[in-house]
Amino acid sequence: MKLPKILKHCRVDEPGHFRLAAHDPAECFGLSTNIDDVKPILAAGIARLEELQQRLYANGQWAVLLVLQGMDAAGKDGVIKHVMSGVNPQGCEVHGFKAPSEEELRHDFLWTTTVRLPENGRIGIFNRSHYEEVLAVRVHPEMLARQKLPLRAVGKDIWQRRFQDICTFERHLSRNGTLILKFHLRISREEQRKRFLARLDEPAKRWKFSMNDVIERKRWDEYMAAYEDMIRATSTDYAPWYVIPADHKHVAWLVVSAAIIEALEGLKLEFPTIKGKALAEIKSAERALKAEKSG
């Protein structure tokens, strides 16, 4: 299957008909399961992203926000490492979001991510995001109690209202020059178990493990239901969700890379045209440098 068709399959364009179960975490789309076979494609994607980021930075009219959501061990860090490895760090910022601090709890639920949005010309990557407020907080109602919300802000329709708030927030960003791409790295429960065991077996990765990871597995079905509701309610043409099969890491890297490249190419970014006084200064500088004696 060619990449454009793969992206169409992964992008949630008709959220009203979306079913998480229709997306197989182990799907390979006909791609080789041997990572060595796809390394050339990955390398080409990295090079193209590097070029597009240079145009984004020089153009300075657009910001890019990449949202990564997934269960523990779904491969969010790996996507950042392997897909964005060619991007200039000066034009890219990565933010990971953990349990909220006391300061964050004193603000509205979108405040934490709002203050970390990328500026024009830059790429912002959210490793988890404001969507935790309709995922983890929904699965764990005790987290909601910590937010000290007024009674009128809490009720059976709170999640629908939060979905609406998120969509309004993202529409505002889109209208003002932020390209938003959201990726749900879909991993199977069995593959997560294998990756947890691999972490425990490898001393260099044990630091990533938390007993809470095992405890959260007991709520797997609740999380899947929350993800399905979230994607159905918040996948829009201006901020689409992509459901990425993540049991095979390199497949996830390829698809995420292709989605970012496709979206950036759609912006038709060009380097600024130099003319007038600025062009005259460049030509003057060129003449002066050529006139200097070497050595």
Located regions from the model:
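Flexible, compositionally biased loop and terminal segments
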Residues: M1-G295
